[in-house]
Amino acid sequence: MSEAKKGHVLFFPYPLQGHINPMIQLAKRLSKKGITSTLIIASKDHREPYTSDDYSITVHTIHDGFFPHEHPHAKFVDLDRFHNSTSRSLTDFISSAKLSDNPPKALIYDPFMPFALDIAKDLDLYVVAYFTQPWLASLVYYHINEGTYDVPVDRHENPTLASFPGFPLLSQDDLPSFACEKGSYPLLHEFVVRQFSNLLQADCILCNTFDQLEPKVVKWMNDQWPVKNIGPVVPSKFLDNRLPEDKDYELENSKTEPDESVLKWLGNRPAKSVVYVAFGTLVALSEKQMKEIAMAISQTGYHFLWSVRESERSKLPSGFIEEAEEKDSGLVAKWVPQLEVLAHESIGCFVSHCGWNSTLEALCLGVPMVGVPQWTDQPTNAKFIEDVWKIGVRVRTDGEGLSSKEEIARCIVEVMEGERGKEIRKNVEKLKVLAREAISEGGSSDKKIDEFVALLT
């Protein structure tokens, strides 16, 4: 049972699943500490509001200025249109909510949308910036915004090492993709950097990490801002189990039916024998890269489970899926319950794009990683996975950005059965323990959440 309700908080995530999920998870934690939450999703599709049965969380959509017939990624290109329309919609929503029987006290917003801070301040709300990505990438973006780091004109002509507080030296290949080369992602470069344009006006700053994971970076950050690290916000079943009904990222009223076929297939494999491959919901690999991965998997001879979206399946080699099924050596699935998969005893390693949510999930469940980073924060995450936390290895690319089948296979074998793989398993088990301690009762992140609740009541 949750405590008597103490306050009402609005959540405003950037409308991508990787940003929405950490917001939902924090709302669940706050619900059990007596806070009522409203999740506001900017969308071109109107949905009727609904309230979760298990939590005091209501979900509303507001219009983002786009229409159903437009490309789903249009909002990521026409940023001004998204900003202007969503600003109006958010202002109207908050103004109306303040007239309700349970008016909100605070807005927790994604810094990808700094305009939300200005709106909330104008409407007299306590304003909280919530970074759903790690400090690793955010610190780089901060220094670009401050002018203390210059993005090179050409990453290949200027391969100098970059230095940031609390970081090891970073090569150009270790930096977030938006920080590697001027002009490569002009709109998105501005988008991620302007997170810091008004951050000092926030009343509180949260991040989906934990103190023990990024200690040197966290120390520097704490000297700059009122930072509270409240992660990892992975569903409670896979961490402290204090919210036994919290088994996935969905809310009770929006749950999809689980696909038991994947877990049944894994149940017939020996312990730590399966290579799990997944590249998230946004990454679209080239056909050439997909074929290199497929050949690498076949070359290693390990059982494999590969999550491949329907839109990507045509990039696989002809006959690859059928051959795997015929030999019972692998399974290519359109969707998998990733947390359940990573928690399964049959999984030996995780071949991943190193997105932050996937990285935290692997770390929390003690699964070694083979990193194949693509863009955004992923290269920096991969650097820390391999060289700082030492919980995986990173696949290298050639001059054209392609990872060869030989390189991918080498890394998989190294993690699955090499001497380095043994050390990696020890290291990821240590971090697994630290992650669970942080979010468990009395842990560093749990204390930060309690401190945050106290600010709201």
UniProtKB/Swiss-Prot annotation:
Keyword Glycosyltransferase among UniProt keywords: yes
Residues annotated as signal peptide: none
Taxonomy, superkingdom: Eukaryota
Any Gene Ontology CC annotation: peroxisome
Residue positions binding UDP-alpha-D-glucose: 281, 336-338, 353-361, 375-378
Broad class of enzyme this protein falls into: transferase
Keyword line: Glycosyltransferase, Transferase
One Gene Ontology term of the molecular function aspect: UDP-glucosyltransferase activity
Keyword Transmembrane helix: no
Entry EC no(s): 2.4.1.-
Recorded family membership: Belongs to the UDP-glycosyltransferase family.
Protein name: UDP-glycosyltransferase 74C1
Organism: Arabidopsis thaliana (Mouse-ear cress)
